[in-house]
From Swiss-Prot:
Residue sites binding Mg(2+) 2 per the record: D315, N317
Domain of life, per lineage: Eukaryota
Protein name (Swiss-Prot/TrEMBL): Inositol-tetrakisphosphate 1-kinase 3
Binding-site residues, ATP: 127, 177, 209-220, 235
PANTHER family documented for this protein: INOSITOL-TETRAKISPHOSPHATE 1-KINASE (PTHR14217), INOSITOL-TETRAKISPHOSPHATE 1-KINASE 3 (PTHR14217:SF39)
EC number: 2.7.1.134, 2.7.1.159
Keyword Transferase part of the UniProt annotation: yes
Origin organism lineage: Eukaryota, Viridiplantae, Streptophyta, Embryophyta, Tracheophyta
Tissue and organ distribution: Highly expressed in leaves and flowers, and at lower levels in roots, stems, cauline leaves and siliques.
Length: 353
């Protein structure tokens, strides 16, 4: 199978919901008649300038307007309670003060959906706890098994790393990632350490993961509510056990999905290029939505080379770069409509009692 480093593959190659502009001129057409919504859905957003540029693209805003959705910037210099009214608050900001403000707003405005709860997002900012939900799940069925690579947390003192690695029984090479995953460029950096001496060059706090050969391909699994899309990306190349003794040093990469971008075109074995089974991804996504309390995130998944059904989750990111996801505009606007539909149902049911 031919794959360029820019190729993107969706699970089914098509949108799950095909709607024309005429059909979606009012969001009421996508909501059950028994639970009508108002004509305009107001989505307040608090995003970084980088996220605004990549996410709030003209095509998204145009499609959203056609569906009755308006994006309104939140002024973080003014009290949040004095802005709006909002149906949904969409955010990706960090800091204790912002979390406090948002939590107070959630309690005072239970009818507004905050995507996503700040405390739940915080769970993904630490790579020590990030993958614990997957590890605890121990997901295994007829479609495959999903786990996490063996890993070790080093909070300080690089001189202690070789001994800690030996005590933990980790095998070289090891992937080193910053402990804090705050969305910054630095938090996406990774290093590949081939030998004991190179471990001393690493900079704690960090997480060390055993490197799993995976054919140089990873799968980015985007979750938007209940929707799932998969994009195939190049990754770090496999490491031969036979060649390992000849390798030494630390190799640094800006992020794993860019690590092998220089590979240009590659002819991939179908067993490497094949997407993970959809039923397995649906079950994994469902369990993670419940376990993490999040609806907007993505997973970096690899398949162990030489197997068909052994998968590892190596990273989870909140509110990732959806602009890189095929047809994200349709997926995301349909998701926002479903959120408001759920709000309307709850209000209608509450009014009956």
């Amino acid at each position: 199978m031919k794959l360029t480093d820019n190729e993107e593959i969706t699970m089914n190659g098509t949108r799950e919901m095909e709607t024309t502009e005429q059909e979606t001129s009012s969001p009421c057409s996508l909501v059950i008649e028994a639970f009508p919504v108002k004509k305009s859905i107001i989505v307040g957003y608090a995003l970084t300038s980088k996220k605004i540029k990549s996410f709030l693209q003209p095509k998204l805003e145009g499609l959203a307007r056609n569906k009755g959705i308006l994006f309104v910037a939140i002024d973080q210099n003014k009290p949040l309670s004095e802005q709006g009214p909002f149906d949904i608050v969409l955010h990706k900001q960090i800091g204790k003060e912002w979390r406090r403000i948002l939590e107070e707003f959630r309690l005072a405005h239970p009818d507004v959906t905050v995507l996503d709860p700040p405390d739940a997002i915080l769970h993904l900012r630490n790579r020590q706890s990030m993958l614990q939900c997957v590890a605890d799940m121990n997901l295994s069925d007829s479609n495959g098994r999903v786990g996490v690579p063996k890993q070790l947390v080093i909070k300080k003192d690089a001189s202690s790393i070789p001994e800690a690695v030996n005590n933990a029984g980790l095998r070289l090479p090891l992937v080193a990632k910053p402990l804090v995953a705050d969305g910054s460029a630095k938090s996406h950096e990774l290093s590949l350490a081939y030998d004991q001496h190179s471990l001393l060059k690493l900079e704690p706090p960090l997480v060390l993961q055993e490197f799993v050969n995976h054919g140089g391909v990873l799968f980015k699994v985007y979750i938007v509510g209940e929707a799932i899309r998969v994009v195939r990306r190049f990754s770090l190349p496999d490491v031969s056990r036979r060649e390992l003794p000849k390798s030494a040093g630390v190799f640094r990469f800006p992020r794993v999905s860019c690590a092998a971008a220089s590979a240009d075109d590659a002819d991939l074995d179908p067993s490497i290029a094949e997407l993970p089974p959809r039923p397995l991804l649906e079950r994994l996504a469902k369990e993670l939505r419940r376990g993490l309390g999040l609806r907007l995130f993505n997973l970096d998944i690899i398949r162990e080379h030489g197997t068909r059904d052994r998968f590892y989750v190596i990273d989870i990111n909140y509110f990732p770069g959806y602009g890189k996801m095929p047809e994200y505009e349709h997926v995301f606007t349909d998701f926002l409509l479903s959120v408001v539909q759920s709000q309307c149902k709850k209000r209608a049911l509450a009014d009956q009692y």
